[in-house]
C-alpha cells in the first residue's frame, strides 16, 4: 500500500476512534429497563458497576448523617437561560431530558462543574411516590436531577462520566402541593415528546427557579449514577427542602410519556422510572445543617412533632396542678366550716339557750 494511502487510513482511524463515546457501550447491544428481564435486578450482569460499591440512590436517615460546618452554600452561575434561546427536550426511553449549556455551572465545589442536562424520576398515578432518594424510608412524589461534569478536568460529560470526581448532581425532592409555574415550563411540552426518540425545543428560563427554598441546606455524599452503567463517580447534593407541584402537574408527568417508539405494537407507559435505594456500605452522609430534619408521611419534621408533644405534656401538667389546687382549696374550706360548727364556745352557747 502506498505511504500516502497508509497515512490517510491512519488519519481516518483516529477520527473514528475520537468520535466514539467515552462512556461504556452496551454489551452485545444490551438494553435496560426498570422492570422485567432487563430490569434493575439484572443490571449488574451487563453493567458490573451496578452491583459494586458507592451505589445510588440511598435512604437518608439519622444513623448515617453527620454535620459538616465546611459545607458552604453553592452558587448557581448562568442558570438564568435566555428566553431567546431554545433548548432540546428529549424522550430517551427512560426519562424526559432537557439539554443544558456548559456555561451554566456550579461554584462552591473543589472544581468547576458545568451543566449538561436535567431529567426527572417519578412513580405512577396509583402510587405517586417516585423519588429515588428517600428520607427516613419515605419516598417523595418525584425527583429532579441536574447533572454537571467536572469541566476543570474533562472536556465533556461523556468523558467525565467514568472518571474520579467526574460528575456532580443536584437532586431536588418533589412533593404534591400547589401549582408550580417554573416546572410547567417543562411539563407543558411533554405532549411533544410523548414517544421514545421524539424531541422538542423549550425556550430558556431560569433553571434556579426549579430549586427549593434555602438551598444552603443539603445532604452531601459520594455515590453513583442511578442508571446503567452506574459509574460510582458522582458527588451528590440532595437538597433538604422539597419543592411542590400540583396534583395535575404530577399526573401529567405520570401519564404523558411512553418508553417505546410511536410505531411500537406494544407501547409501554413511562412510569416508575426510579431505582430502588441501595446499600450504603458504611459511608457517611454529610449535612450542611446542624439539626437533622426527618420527614414523616404527614410532612412534619421531628422538631415540630417533639414541640407539639412537649406542649401537650405541659398542658396536661397544668391541668393536673390546677385540679389539685382546686381540690385542696375545697378541702380546706370544708374543714374550716366544720371547725365553726364544733367549737366548744359555740356548744356552750347552744346549751345556755336551751
Swiss-Prot record:
Inhibited by coumarins, saccharin, sulfonamide derivatives such as acetazolamide (AZA), benzenesulfonamide and derivatives (4-carboxyethylbenzene-sulfonamide, 4-carboxyethylbenzene-sulfonamide ethyl ester, 4-(acetyl-2-aminoethyl)benzene-sulfonamide, 4-aminoethylbenzene-sulfonamide) and Foscarnet (phosphonoformate trisodium salt). The chain crosses the membrane at residues 302-322. It is found in: Membrane; Cell membrane. PROSITE patterns: ALPHA_CA_1, ALPHA_CA_2. Residues 1-24 form the signal peptide. Residues 323-354 are cytoplasmic. Disulfide bonds join 50-230. It is a single-pass type I membrane protein. Residues 30-289 form the Alpha-carbonic anhydrase domain. GO terms for molecular function: carbonate dehydratase activity; zinc ion binding. Its EC number is 4.2.1.1. Substrate binds at residues 226-227. The active site is at 94 (proton donor/acceptor). Coiled coil: none annotated. Residues 25-301 are extracellular. Changing residue 143 to K: In HYCHL; severe decrease of activity in the presence of physiological NaCl concentrations; mutant enzyme is highly inhibited by acetazolamide and shows higher sensitivity to inhibition by anions compared to wild-type; the mutation affects the chloride-mediated negative feedback regulation of the enzyme leading to excessive chloride secretion in sweat; no effect on localization to cell membrane. GO terms for biological process: chloride ion homeostasis; estrous cycle. CDD domains: alpha_CA_XII_XIV. Gene3D superfamilies: Alpha carbonic anhydrase. Highly expressed in colon, kidney, prostate, intestine and activated lymphocytes. Expressed at much higher levels in the renal cell cancers than in surrounding normal kidney tissue. Moderately expressed in pancreas, ovary and testis. Expressed in sweat glands and bronchiolar epithelium. It catalyses: hydrogencarbonate + H(+) = CO2 + H2O. Keywords: Cell membrane, Disease variant, Disulfide bond, Glycoprotein, Lyase, Membrane, Metal-binding, Signal, Transmembrane, Transmembrane helix, Zinc. Homodimer. Reversible hydration of carbon dioxide. This is Carbonic anhydrase 12. The gene is CA12.
